[in-house]
């Protein structure tokens, strides 16, 4: 792992105000991003950009992983649901933050990606991550409720099925929209649903029963 490159990225994110949680900073410096991308892209592992992982999917840019983790206000011991495993990198970062007393449930619709991510996470010792191959727009009621939920693909709206699986006082972060997307922070607070727009983003489409029905 090119630690100096990641240190420079993390320092830049802190200076730009994107990264306030020291636990997120530590996790970014710990997880070897190069392990989650194709070998031919290893030279770009510690460049703050999305990278192609096959099947029309990408590993998110480092700053986007940081922004989502920061917005979720992750705590040690949290149970977290991720929709869109992709490479497994984001799940590994979250797993570092929530620790061995926490748990990450991550759902991936593409079998090949789910299998590869599970293999990589297992190799790196992330025993607190469970990979499920299935329709992420439905969530996973088996392990609900969750302290935090986040999506790595953008749907027409935040699926009610996921909001229902969020604990009272929980937080959910999701990109919403198709060609024009916004990153939305949703909180269940005092019996109300509160939403905040965190800014414009660009994610792959959320495919499934409660998402888009086709690739765009």
Swiss-Prot record:
InterPro entries documented for this protein: PCMT (IPR000682), SAM-dependent_MTases_sf (IPR029063)
UniProt xrefs under Pfam families: PCMT
Gene3D superfamilies documented for this protein: Vaccinia Virus protein VP39
GO molecular function: protein-L-isoaspartate (D-aspartate) O-methyltransferase activity
Active site, renumbered: 60
Single Gene Ontology BP annotation: protein modification process
Main location as per UniProt: cytoplasm
Keyword Membrane: no
CDD domains: AdoMet_MTases
UniProt keywords, alphabetically: Cytoplasm, Methyltransferase, S-adenosyl-L-methionine, Transferase
Subcellular location: Cytoplasm
Reaction equations catalysed: [protein]-L-isoaspartate + S-adenosyl-L-methionine = [protein]-L-isoaspartate alpha-methyl ester + S-adenosyl-L-homocysteine
A Gene Ontology cellular-component term: cytoplasm
Annotated family: Belongs to the methyltransferase superfamily. L-isoaspartyl/D-aspartyl protein methyltransferase family.
Functional note: Catalyzes the methyl esterification of L-isoaspartyl residues in peptides and proteins that result from spontaneous decomposition of normal L-aspartyl and L-asparaginyl residues. It plays a role in the repair and/or degradation of damaged proteins.
PANTHER family hit by this protein: PROTEIN-L-ISOASPARTATE O-METHYLTRANSFERASE, PROTEIN-L-ISOASPARTATE(D-ASPARTATE) O-METHYLTRANSFERASE
Protein name, UniProt field: Protein-L-isoaspartate O-methyltransferase
Gene encoding the protein: pcm
């Amino acid at each position: 792992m090119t630690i100096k490159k990641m240190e420079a990225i993390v320092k830049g994110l802190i200076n730009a105000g994107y990264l306030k949680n020291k636990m997120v900073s530590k996790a970014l410096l710990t997880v070897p991003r190069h392990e989650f991308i194709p070998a031919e892209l290893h030279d770009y592992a510690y460049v703050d950009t999305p990278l192609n992982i096959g099947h029309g999917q990408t590993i998110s840019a480092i700053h986007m992983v940081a922004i989502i983790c920061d917005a979720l206000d992750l705590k040690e011991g949290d149970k977290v649901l991720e929709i869109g495993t992709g490479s497994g990198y984001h799940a590994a970062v979250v797993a570092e933050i929530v620790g061995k007393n926490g748990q990450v449930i991550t759902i991936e619709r593409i079998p090949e990606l789910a299998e590869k991510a599970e293999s990589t996470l297992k190799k790196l010792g992330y025993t607190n991550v469970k990979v499920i191959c299935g329709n992420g727009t439905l969530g996973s009621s088996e392990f609900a409720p969750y302290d935090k939920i986040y999506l790595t693909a953008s749907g027409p709206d935040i699926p009610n099925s996921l909001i229902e699986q969020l604990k009272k006082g929980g937080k959910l972060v999701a990109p919403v929209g198709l060609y024009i997307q916004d990153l939305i922070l949703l909180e269940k607070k005092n019996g109300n649903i509160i939403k905040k727009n965190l800014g414009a983003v660009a994610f792959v489409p959320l495919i499934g029963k409660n998402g888009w029905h086709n690739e765009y």
